[in-house]
Amino acid sequence: MKNMEQIDFVVTWVNDKDVDWCKRKSEFEKEYNIFQDLNSEERYREWGLMKYWFRAVEKYAPWVNKIYFITEGHVPNWLDVNHPKLVHVKHEDYIEKQFLPTFNSNVIEMNLIHLKDLSEKFVLFNDDFFINDFVKQSDFFENNLPKDTGIFSPLIPRENSLTPIILNNMEIINKYFSKKKILEQNFSKFFNIKYGKHLLKNICLLPWSDLLGFYDNHIPVSYCKSNFLEVYEKEHAIFNLTFKNKFRNKNEINHWLIRYWQLSSGNFIPRNINFGKNYAISNDPTDIINELKLSKYKIICINDGESIDNFDAVKGLMINAFEKKFPEKSSFEKK
């Protein structure tokens, strides 16, 4: 790998048990006509797995430069905020005061353009994304380009989905990019055997001249900070509209817009589709527990299922499975 610069990780976290935070959230919910399908309680629910996120990073990605741990202000009581690789960032440290407080993950993530010390190359995690096996820098960046999958996928409207937000992203992408030119300039990046059966999607969508959407596999995204800045300069109005939303709203954008921009620009290197997998937690998390044992995928997303009947019981099973996989404390934990 040539000219590889340092790579940072960024992860966002919320403590839904923080009394003050819950009180403020409740007060603002009364003022705003929020979309429940985009702001359900499950989207804020904390599973007690954050310490295992750090243990996984230390074990499987010790090469990481800095970890930007972004919160409203609270930190887990076990976290050593003085760790040399850890940068604890409060919302007030990089988001303009006029947009605070915010309970909108899109505001938190899209404001990364204002995080001055963040490396040009970084990987954005949600707190439900876990490294599940040894990874290299080249799994995320190669020749200074992000690793990703250039797979087309039409948008399908579903209840309780992000489709309205993704549609806003795609409207901007179609404003600046021509599918014909994308394929003329980067054909091999979109028709690549690394995509496996998903390659059929690109073949089937060839007759359509417009970009109908991209496949989102819900794993950490590799970003170049300069791409965030480029899109912000061109579309600052929609950024600022998003920043004003205290809660997620159907009129805004999310960070996938920058991912789509990188894909449409050809500024990426194709990555094997089996690098990561998205799992939805259900009443029976056996498939996730088995994945933790077998490590078939290097990255996993453990997506909160909104139909869990016994949250505490399932949470206990998950914590037990992670404890078995990562029994040793990381250096990010207080002694």
Swiss-Prot record:
Key words, A-Z: Exopolysaccharide synthesis, Transferase
GO molecular function: transferase activity, transferring phosphorus-containing groups
UniProt keyword annotation of Transferase present: yes
Record Pfam families: Stealth_CR2 (PF11380)
InterPro entries given in the database record: Stealth (IPR047141), Stealth_CR2 (IPR021520)
Listed EC numbers: 2.7.-.-
Gene Ontology biological-process entries: polysaccharide biosynthetic process
Keyword Cell wall biogenesis/degradation: no
Family of this protein: Belongs to the stealth family.
Further information: Stealth proteins are part of a protein family that is conserved from bacteria to higher eukaryotes. Family members were first identified in microbes as proteins that help pathogens to elude the host innate immune system. Microbial stealth proteins are involved in the biosynthesis of exopolysaccharides. Stealth proteins are predicted to function as hexose-1-phosphoryltransferases.
The protein's name: Capsular polysaccharide phosphotransferase WcwK
